[in-house]
Amino acid sequence: MRILPVVAAVTAAFLVVACSSPTPPKGVTVVNNFDAKRYLGTWYEIARFDHRFERGLDKVTATYSLRDDGGINVINKGYNPDREMWQKTEGKAYFTGDPSTAALKVSFFGPFYGGYNVIALDREYRHALVCGPDRDYLWILSRTPTISDEMKQQMLAIATREGFEVNKLIWVKQPGA
């Protein structure tokens, strides 16, 4: 019996399931009365849970713009100081239901989608707390490269209340930080 085809099939099935869940984690509430047009533009990544696709990157930003098909273009960019170069990835996002609810699915790789859920957002759309499909993905975003200690504590309190292990956050090096 050849084991390689079996391993490949199991791996492919795992990737489809792991990367296609666009729902928020159980018990986590996403933002309602969401206005996607106000969310568009550039956001600075203030903190994140560490993952291989962003490991070692500084000066990380995410820029969102409208797509012709009603979705949202996503451009993530970060500086890799070890390689002394910028890295960029482009993706697309779509609402999983009502666009006034901040639950989206995002893809950076073909047909594979993962959750992008805005779980906290200030009235001015200047600070956001975003999670993925489970509690292993969390980001604190801001329209500016730095945030106040007060805003940092607010975001940490919300993340803790929603069941995220905030001690796992890494704080991203940004200009002026």
Swiss-Prot record:
GO terms for molecular function: lipid binding. One of its GO terms (cellular component) is cell outer membrane. Keywords: Cell outer membrane, Lipid-binding, Lipoprotein, Membrane, Palmitate, Signal. InterPro entries: Calycin (IPR012674), Lipocalin_ApoD (IPR022271), Lipocalin_bac (IPR002446), Lipocalin_Blc-like_dom (IPR047202), Lipocalin_CS (IPR022272), Lipocln_cytosolic_FA-bd_dom (IPR000566). The keyword Zinc-finger does not apply. Residues 1-18 form the signal peptide. A lipid is attached at residue 19 (N-palmitoyl cysteine). Transmembrane segments: none annotated. It is found in: Cell outer membrane. Homodimer. Belongs to the calycin superfamily. Lipocalin family. This is Outer membrane lipoprotein Blc.
